[in-house]
């Protein structure tokens, strides 16, 4: 990350503050590589892909000292496709990843308003309870043979269905995150539906989460319910909750993760269990995990086994090269075809019960 002094020029004009009263930070993530997929609609494919190990982001974070241990804070983050430079999720969009402003106190915590992550992402992903966040990237998050889950405005109906990839944020939201209380951090969030005549419940989002860390052991839990205008006039949606545990042992750490996703209108539901291990020994970071995804009767009792292995080699403090492999096997109904998360396109689903992926890439942070 690169800090730059904007207080004397920009911030001072906008806020009347002196340079010592605040700061702004430019930050970003860049990832690109080449991926091989064994079966996309019955055919092999080799292609350029980006935003896999980490999403391609750039943004600004800023603070202004208010006195008494309090600060005003803001964050504006844009996502883009490195291959063509287009903004995501749609060309022309700006700061679509996060856009928030708020107040922070070391003693009381923070209150933020805007478009921001719910606690499935905050508590479980950023709490390092998911191997996908630590080494597996987008391909290691969950999708599988569950298109009937029917998430609105979702490219496959089940892409990132438990929300841990952070691909879905909460607009029009108010979020409280506590200070660190002897290792415990908790939070609450409410996202307004902004639907005239719909009351506070329609199209709304409610989320809560916590993380407790002591020594080498950590626990996390999170809940979110998102209601969509396409589902029962904004009174039904998707409900997610999850639990995570992490234990560090010398250069190794182990993680366990459980998530449950339910369509509150149709009753379709998926349970996920993941177990993983990571080794960190400079310049190497090596990780592997296994996850089992199981749908209920509304999803034809389809299931998927998935194994991911990845290795990163640090070229510097900011830049790494990496390799990754993912294998998924799907079962259940006759139409249960494997589909690794992040393999996109009209024929991206495997024509069979298995799909294998290998990737080589690089990432850098600033």
What are these regions (language model features)?
Residues 14-19:
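N-terminal signal peptide c-region/cleavage motif recognized by signal peptidases
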Residues 43-46, 86, 161, 196, ...:
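Extracellular loop and loop/strand-boundary signature of outer-membrane beta-barrel proteins
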Residues 24-32, 68, 72-76, 111, ...:
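Transmembrane beta-strands of outer-membrane beta-barrel proteins
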Residues 61-65, 104-106, 177-180, 211-215, ...:
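Structural signature of outer-membrane beta-barrel channels/translocons
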Residues 206-314, 324-328:
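Detector for outer-membrane/organellar transmembrane beta-barrel domains
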Residues 350-366:
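Outer-membrane beta-barrel "beta-signal"
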């Amino acid at each position: 990350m690169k800090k730059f002094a904007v207080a004397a020029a920009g911030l001072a004009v906008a806020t009347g503050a002196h340079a010592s009263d605040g700061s702004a930070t430019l930050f970003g993530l860049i990832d690109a590589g080449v991926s091989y997929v064994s079966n996309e609609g019955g055919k092999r494919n080799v292609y350029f892909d980006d935003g896999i190990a980490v999403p391609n982001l750039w943004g600004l974070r800023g603070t202004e000292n208010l006195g008494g241990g309090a600060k005003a804070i803001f964050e504006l983050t844009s996502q883009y496709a490195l291959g063509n430079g287009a903004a995501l999720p749609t060309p022309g969009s700006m700061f679509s990843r996060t856009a928030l402003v708020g107040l922070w106190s070391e003693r009381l915590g923070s209150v933020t308003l805007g478009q921001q992550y719910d606690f499935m992402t905050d508590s479980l992903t950023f709490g390092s309870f998911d191997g996908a966040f630590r080494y597996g990237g987008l391909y290691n998050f969950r999708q599988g043979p569950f298109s009937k889950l029917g998430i609105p405005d979702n490219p496959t109906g089940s892409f990132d269905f438990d929300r841990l990839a952070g691909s879905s944020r909460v607009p029009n939201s108010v979020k409280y995150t506590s200070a660190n209380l002897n290792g415990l951090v908790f939070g609450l969030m409410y996202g307004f539906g902004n639907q005239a005549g719909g009351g506070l419940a329609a199209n709304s989002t409610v989320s809560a989460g916590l993380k407790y860390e002591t020594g080498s052991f950590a626990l996390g839990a999170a809940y979110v319910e998102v209601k969509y205008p396409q589902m029962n006039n904004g009174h039904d949606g998707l409900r997610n909750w999850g639990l995570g545990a992490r234990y560090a042992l010398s250069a190794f750490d182990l993680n366990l993760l459980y998530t449950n996703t339910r369509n509150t209108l149709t009753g379709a539901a998926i349970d996920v269990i993941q177990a993983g291990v990571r080794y960190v020994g400079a310049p190497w970071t090596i990780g592997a995990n296994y996850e089992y995804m199981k749908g209920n009767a509304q999803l034809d009792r389809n299931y998927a086994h998935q194994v991911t292995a990845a290795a990163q080699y640090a070229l510097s403090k900011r830049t790494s090269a990496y390799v990754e492999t993912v294998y998924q096997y799907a079962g259940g109904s006759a139409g249960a075809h494997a589909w690794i998360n992040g393999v996109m396109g009209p024929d991206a689903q495997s024509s069979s019960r298995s799909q294998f992926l290998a990737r080589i890439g690089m990432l850098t942070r600033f």
